[in-house]
């Protein structure tokens, strides 16, 4: 699997096919038992997650993993750039999610699912990542917030030149934003290519739940 710099790459497949495991291997939660992971020409397979974060990889997992007893502001501070010892919130990142600016003193656990997802993505963006990795960012999210998330992903790709890698099941969302798609079946890449491959009936059958 080769992920192109500056592109939005979507990984799709039925539940249980290894999509989340793949993302967690990229960011260092698992080590590959076969093959290796190259990033900018360097094998990073043995690096710990924090070492990969220093290289510019940021991850928004399924479930968001925000801190429920920390305020929104405190949650955001946990994502500040560990490379630059920055201790100020980036107003540009906050401007992408206006609702968060209104909730800085609220506890993370008091937010709705959609608000928590915005918080999780904003926290990752505060790391100023070169590669943003998201695991099903639209899961359980209302349409209005899905649009916000879509606009943010496109913005950071086009303006910040950030490489985006995401696992996603929502067809319309993928067709709107993806440059390339990898279809995973039983832990292997079944097919890959431009987003137009999703129109293939065989692909739709593979992805049918």
Please place each PLM-identified region on the residue numbering.
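The feature captures the beta-strand-to-loop junction immediately N-terminal to the Walker
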Residues: 12-14
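Helix-to-loop junction immediately C-terminal to a conserved catalytic motif
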Residues: 27
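Conserved ABC transporter NBD signature motif
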Residues: 35-42, 55, 88-95, 191
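ABC ATPase NBD coupling module
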Residues: 43-63, 102-105, 198-204
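ABC ATPase signature
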Residues: 70, 111, 124-125
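Conserved ABC ATPase signature
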Residues: 107-111, 115
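A short, proline-enriched helix->beta-strand linker immediately N-terminal to the Walker B motif
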Residues: 126-130
């Amino acid at each position: 699997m080769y992920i192109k710099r500056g592109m939005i790459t979507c990984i799709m497949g039925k539940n249980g096919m290894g999509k989340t495991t793949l993302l967690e291997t990229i960011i260092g939660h698992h080590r590959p038992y076969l093959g290796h992971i190259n990033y900018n020409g360097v094998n990073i397979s043995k690096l710990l997650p924090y070492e990969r974060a220093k290289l510019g990889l940021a991850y928004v997992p399924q479930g968001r993993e925000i801190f429920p007893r920390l305020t929104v502001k405190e949650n955001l501070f946990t994502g500040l750039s560990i490379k630059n010892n920055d201790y100020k919130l980036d107003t540009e990142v906050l401007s992408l999610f206006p609702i968060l600016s209104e909730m800085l003193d609220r506890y993370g656990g008091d937010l709705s699912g959609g608000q928590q997802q915005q918080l999780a993505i904003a926290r990752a963006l505060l790391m100023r990542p070169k590669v943003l990795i998201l695991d099903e960012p639209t899961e359980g999210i209302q349409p209005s917030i899905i649009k916000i998330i879509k606009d943010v992903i496109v913005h950071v790709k086009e303006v910040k030149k950030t490489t985006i890698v995401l696992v996603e099941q929502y067809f319309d969302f993928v067709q709107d934003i993806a440059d390339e798609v990898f279809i995973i079946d039983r832990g292997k890449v079944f097919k890959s290519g431009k987003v137009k491959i999703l129109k293939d009936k065989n692909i739709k059958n593979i992805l049918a739940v």
